[in-house]
Amino acid sequence: MIPLEKPGSGGSPSAAASGSGPGGLLTEIRTAIRTEPFQDCYSLSPGRELGRGKFAVVRKCIQKDSGKEFAAKFMRKRRKGQDCRMEIIHEIAVLELAQDNPWVINLHEVYETSSEMILVLEYAAGGEISDQCVADRDEAFNEKDVQRLMRQILEGVHFLHTHDVVHLDLKPQNILLTSESPLGDIKIVDFGLSRIVKNSEELREIMGTPEYVAPEILSYDPISMATDMWSIGVLTYVMLTGISPFLGDNKQETFLNISQMNLSYSEEEFDTVSESAVDFIKKLLVKKPEDRATAEECLKHPWLTQSSIQDPVLRVKEALEEANALQKGDSVPEISSATEKPGTEESIVTEELIVVTSYTLGQCRQSEKEKMEQKAISKRFKFEEPLLQEIPGEFIY
């Protein structure tokens, strides 16, 4: 095995990404780390950053020779007085491992200076899916969109899981789109919190983004592939409704909602969502990790295998026709128990969805019935920093 390169050592290739070190980190890479100035080969595009976190910033760049667009992720090697180069090496190794998977962002090359490492990544022009999650209803994802994108997310996650990689920070900000209009394909990004988890080993860490962490994280139980599946359940809920299911007014309340499974599948939140989609979410938002559906099982769920979904507009039209029939005293066909909507939790009525982050992304989707209940509890869609602050998380890629 060739030892990892340090700055100034020539930039020859390092070893294959097969070695696993302490704490579930990969320790070996095969990418040649380049030490010449990044600006010799790339020019940074003017305009706003693609993303920023405590220890990293992502900028759009242009390769001078080819004119191709990339995303450059500048990552500080020292964080809070600690050398975190090996965490960056791990992220590179995971990207190498997934280089042939179409649903994981592609790593182009790596540069290193005395203070930072620069990952040159595939540029996803469509941005984060969080933009659609918080959009007004006419601009948000429809269920068919979510079906297609969730199938891609699951195929990517299934690939990672078969290679013992658990992402541990799956959320709308870490799922990018190749294009916004027409709606493109997904790219899973940001493996800063990812870990290697093997069946014979136990890994316990407090990490993740509050709204998306699984109950076992909060109880300090072992992390597993099922930890990602919980996050996918939350992600699906958000993509379909624009509502963050467990969000409280603070982190403590959010964690309490997660640990006590305080969430709603009411008619108000899922008024345009199929019963099959709700069942899909319920297979994932299960407290015991061993009872959650795996990525492979999810890909076989009827919601993702059926050929079509009833048009949400048609479903709303039918509901209005039924309501009109009731007002006129006409009979309405009885709905079988197999197609009934989940019961409403009257204690929680969602009033609004507000984005809280370092900048405002604009008004989010609002419930159609928000004015009917003065004591409604707001659910806010926050872009939180991951719990493990030593590793970057609140940025694109």
From Swiss-Prot:
Modification sites for Phosphoserine: S9
The record's InterPro entries line, in alphabetical order, gives: DRAK1_STKc, Kinase-like_dom_sf, Prot_kinase_dom, Protein_kinase_ATP_BS, Ser/Thr_kinase_AS
Specify the enzyme's EC class, one word.
Answer: transferase
Q: Which domain of life is it from?
A: Eukaryota
Which molecular-function annotations from GO does this UniProt entry contain?
ATP binding; protein serine kinase activity; protein serine/threonine kinase activity
Summarizing activity control, the record says: Inhibited by thiazolidinedione-type compounds: inhibited by furan- and pyridone- thiazolidinediones.
Against PANTHER family, the record matches this protein to: SERINE/THREONINE-PROTEIN KINASE 17, SERINE_THREONINE-PROTEIN KINASE 17A
Function of the protein:
Acts as a positive regulator of apoptosis. May also act as a regulator of cellular reactive oxygen species.
Which named protein is this? Serine/threonine-protein kinase 17A
- Lineage per the UniProt record: Eukaryota, Metazoa, Chordata, Craniata, Vertebrata
Gene of origin?
Answer: STK17A
